[in-house]
Design a protein with these regions (language model features):
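A conserved structural/catalytic subdomain of Rossmann-like adenosyl-cofactor enzymes
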Residues: 4-5, 9-257
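Long, low-complexity or tandemly repetitive, helically biased scaffold regions used
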Residues: 259-261
């Protein structure tokens, strides 16, 4: 089912309905979707996956996935999931259900698509180098080509770069998946996915089915910059700019005085 964000967290009748659904054990997966996924609606929504045939060992749990920040931009008003992104989202569900064989088959599919058996991070790094080298080659070739041939030369390299970037995108999706789940072990990922029990949902979260209430936020990556040291550097730069500004104002004022203004 596709539902609004309101119906998965509102109280009143909506809450009563959610409680009854949760108590059945048939709520399988809840997924948040970002903006601009539908032509007629730009607002975010939620996907409800209900399953009366859930295995016994999963009846007491629900998988929450927050995919609001995971998508491909088509244009200013349209987002979508690429085929590989859809496969990755499916892979999270497979691992939650213990279907590791499907996950491993996806890794094999990635390697086949990339025609490379190295670790995905190595493949990504190599492709990034290839893209950069191709850009530099293209720039030099276009500059060296006769004026009448420059457009054709640029188009030739654009096609080659497009093919390389497509492979790089696939490699990045493979890295995105394997950095989180390795060779096929499900784990809760802050900001992305979380398995919660019916007791937690009903008694601690007020029957909310909002994935964001469970998955939390992704940790902020450390960029390796010493904040205090950087602030001192910025302060010093500001003082130098202020001093330079004062000197310029003095020069301008002096010149105006000499002109009798």
């Amino acid at each position: 089912l596709v539902g609004s964000e309101m119906c998965i967290r509102d109280r009143g009748k909506d809450k009563d309905i959610r409680e009854k659904l949760i108590q059945t054990g048939h709520v399988d997966v809840m997924m948040s979707v970002g903006n601009n996924f539908f032509y007629t609606k730009s607002l975010p929504c939620s996907l409800w996956f209900l399953d009366k045939g859930k295995p016994e060992h999963l009846l007491d749990t629900v998988l929450f996935i927050d995919a609001r920040n995971y998508y491909t931009v088509v244009d200013r008003t349209q987002n979508e999931w690429s085929d590989w992104q859809l496969k990755n989202l499916n892979a999270i569900v497979w691992l939650y259900r213990g279907e590791v064989d499907k996950y491993k088959a996806l890794l094999t599919e990635y390697h086949a698509e990339l025609a490379d058996d190295r670790p995905f991070a190595e493949i990504q790094a190599a492709l990034e180098q290839n893209v950069q080298a191709k850009r530099e080659e293209a720039k030099a070739a276009v500059e060296a080509a006769p004026r009448k041939e420059r457009k054709a030369t640029q188009e030739k390299f654009d096609k080659e770069l497009e093919a390389l970037n497509e492979k790089l995108t696939v490699a990045k999706e493979a890295v995105w998946l394997t950095e989180k789940f390795g060779e096929g072990v499900y784990q809760d990922i802050p900001g992305l996915c979380k398995v919660a029990s019916r007791d937690t949902i009903l008694n601690e979260k007020g029957a909310s089915l909002t994935p964001g209430a469970y998955v939390g936020v992704a940790p902020v990556e450390d960029d390796g910059v010493d904040f205090a040291q950087r602030m001192k550097e910025i302060h010093k730069e500001l003082l130098e700019l202020q001093a330079e500004s004062n000197r310029l104002m003095e020069t301008i004022s002096k010149n105006l005085e000499e002109m009798g203004v």
